Amino acid sequence: MKVLLLLCSCILVIHALPFEQRGFWDFSMDDGMAMMKDEEASGVGPIPTESIPDVGLPPMDLCPFGCQCHLRVVQCSDLGLTSIPKNLPKDTTLLDLQNNKITEIKKDDFKGLTNLYALVIVNNKISKINEKAFEPLQKMQKLYISKNNLEEIPKNLPKSLVELRIHENKIKKVPKGVFSGLKNMNCIEMGGNPLENGGIEAGAFDGLKLNYLRVSEAKLSGIPKGLPSTLNELHLDNNKIQAIEKEDLSQYASLYRLGLGHNNIRMIENGSLSFMPVLRELHLDNNKLSKVPPGLPDMKLLQVVYLHSNNITQVGVNDFCPIGFGVKRAYYNGISLFNNPVPYWEVQPATFRCVTDRLAIQFGNYRK
């Protein structure tokens, strides 16, 4: 009986599935990464073992020491690395090198990585990138290189690039031509750099069809000129912008979210907001406005307005909603006016006649 049990145990071990490492890193990527994982996991059903010729195991790329490799994802984060690891697997699609001490990206660091889809190299000490370092990466769509010591935007970025996150570096200049040929790019995050208006050269964004641009926490004194007219979201929070003039927003007809909070804005010229007919969300909190911006009643799709923490002393009955029989196509679902020196008990109820719910109005915290 003992022999029989031993034989059964051996048979179970022989036919057991190989160990599969799971869940070592749940990197939140888009549908592109999910598709790559599905492709890796897909099969065509069981194949009789007798039909498979014995040709030996194919050569395999070794995982760099200390890294973890799984489903073409190579994770080398938090290892104290001072340079890009050598001999990375050639089929790598996602390379994570964040939270290391890498200081430089050399010419051949990514040689052979022709299938790389995303490179995450956030929070290192990179100050130098060879002009030809990205040449092999002809399929790369996402480059996350924030929190480094870069003083300029890398040159010769892959033409396939869709998303660039380069915030919290030391970049002071966006030269004309640095984004040349990047026709697929739709998202740039470059806040937290010491950028001034004069540092953005005329034509720097020419040819780009961006949907999203963030230049927050910089040193901008006004809304930059010549940004892509295709923008859906523009975030310029935490700068030093003092005024919005009529022509500043004249080319952004597709904009539906505008972030201008935490600036020094005192004045918004009449008609400035009329160029954005599809705007849905407007952030003007933490500025120095003394009144509600003109033109809000004419914005048929506007739903959210942040005006808290300003110097607004009065709110008129027609400051938000259309006059008479004018109709909004979308009612407000969020208006914030708290922390202003306006006596909220003096505001007429009809002021908010085009708000979906009274709970959507954030008032109170009266500031003298």
Curated annotation (Swiss-Prot):
Pfam families: LRR_8 (PF13855), LRRNT (PF01462)
Major localisation: secreted
LRR repeats: 82-102, 103-126, 127-150, 151-171, 172-195, 196-220, 221-241, 242-265, 266-289, 290-312, 313-342, 343-368
UniProt signal peptide: 1-16
Keyword Protease in annotation: no
Transmembrane region(s): none
Record-annotated disulphide pairs: 63-69, 67-76, 321-354
Record keywords: Disulfide bond, Extracellular matrix, Glycoprotein, Leucine-rich repeat, Proteoglycan, Repeat, Secreted, Signal
Domain of life: Eukaryota
Protein name: Biglycan
Organism, scientific name: Xenopus laevis
Organism classification: Eukaryota, Metazoa, Chordata, Craniata, Vertebrata
